[in-house]
Amino acid sequence: MAAPSPSTLTASLMAAKKAKGLSFADLEVALGLDEVWIASLFYGQATASPEEAEKLATLLGLDPAITAALQEFPTKGSLDPVIPTDPLIYRFYEIMQVYGMPLKDVIQEKFGDGIMSAIDFTLDVDKVEDPKGDRVKVTMCGKFLPYKKW
């Protein structure tokens, strides 16, 4: 049996999650993995261990082809290269357009010439209640990797 396409994999996982009435936060509790990481797995941007894939398969009632596909090494960052049109995703694009260079400068002033890893990395999303309207708090924590001189 051929491996499901990334879009089929995502659609199958989302349908199974919806059918079980689960949120990513529910899956975090059940699997012991962060909800953002689990969501990245659903979108084909992460790889599950055999144990993680089996646990998710049992929880969601996944078929063997989907379970096997979760264990494959994905092509990361394989989103459409055009400017995103989804309003929420576009805001992150807009944030990088406005604050990308300032953020780069501040990071390099504090750490030197290098980058923030997206491999040795965590991403957390929290809800901050505010009487003027709830706020979204996104925390990125990546290892600093200095550029090597040779």
Curated annotation (Swiss-Prot):
Please give the Gene Ontology molecular function terms for this protein. cyanate hydratase activity; DNA binding
Report which superkingdom the organism of origin falls in: Bacteria
Active-site residues? R91, E94, S117
**Which EC numbers characterise this protein's activity in its record?**
4.2.1.104
Q: What class of enzyme is it?
A: lyase
Q: Which UniProt keywords apply?
A: Lyase
The protein's annotated catalytic reaction(s) are: cyanate + hydrogencarbonate + 3 H(+) = NH4(+) + 2 CO2
InterPro entries the UniProt entry points to: Cro/C1-type_HTH, Cyanase, Cyanate_lyase_C, Cyanate_lyase_C_sf, CYNS_N, Lambda_DNA-bd_dom_sf
Q: Could you tell me what this protein does?
A: Catalyzes the reaction of cyanate with bicarbonate to produce ammonia and carbon dioxide.
Per the record, the similarity remark reads: Belongs to the cyanase family.
Q: Please state what the protein is called.
A: Cyanate hydratase
